[in-house]
Amino acid sequence: MFNNSFWIFFAIIHFIIVLLFYKGFGKMGLFVWIGFATVCANLQVVKTVELFGLTATLGNVMYGTIFFATDVLNEKYGPAEARKAVWLGFSTLLTLTFVMQGVLLFEPASSDISQTALETIFGFLPRVALGSLLAFIFSQTLDVYVYSAIRRIFPSDRLLWLRNGGSTAVSQLFDTFIFTAVAFLGIYPADVWLHIFISTYLIKFAVSLISLPYAYAAKKMIPNDERSS
């Protein structure tokens, strides 16, 4: 019960922090958040918890804020800025994976106490690392495209929820499928893999629903650097 209520609070706090970054630092704040969230989500993902009867990773909340941030960039600054943010996030993830694999290659001192912990967090199996990278770049690029397509058809501010929720729901479906297929398909029995796929997507979808009120707040928000210019 604690996990369920705290997870909702945890998710709300995440989106409030994104808005604070946007308010305080404008467009640059969203770019910084996307880089930070990409790293942080891949640290959190190693911890699994029970949520609403499902086994899930904590990284899904932080990962969901990346879609939220790119949607805000798309809505207020256009798809070109959103795509730039996607490539920033992908480059950050790729660099993190490469650099930390190098760190693990160093032989630890006899007095070292961190190697085992680092291996737990960063010792990705090749399939998991590949699945994460492929899922990120494909789903984030798709999110920008779908958001822009929905906006062309439904440009009204009242339908911001449709643009935000629709693009995220579609792109996260592909994100979940690509990651779980590359990382786990063939390793686990088909029924276990299907359970992982469904439970992961449901958690991500719940995060996208929580984000909707904050999308309207971001739409109305004028960052400090734009107010003074």
Swiss-Prot record:
GO terms for biological process: pyrimidine-containing compound transmembrane transport; queuosine salvage. Its main location: membrane. The chain crosses the membrane at residues 6-26, 28-48, 49-69, 86-106, 118-138, 160-182, 192-214. It is found in: Cell membrane. GO terms for cellular component: plasma membrane. It is a multi-pass membrane protein. The keyword Isomerase does not apply. InterPro entries: YhhQ. Pfam families: Vut_1. Keywords: Cell membrane, Membrane, Transmembrane, Transmembrane helix, Transport. One of its GO terms (molecular function) is transmembrane transporter activity. Involved in the import of queuosine (Q) precursors, required for Q precursor salvage. Belongs to the vitamin uptake transporter (VUT/ECF) (TC 2.A.88) family. Q precursor transporter subfamily. This is Probable queuosine precursor transporter. It comes from Bacillus subtilis (strain 168). The lineage of its organism: Bacteria, Bacillati, Bacillota, Bacilli, Bacillales.
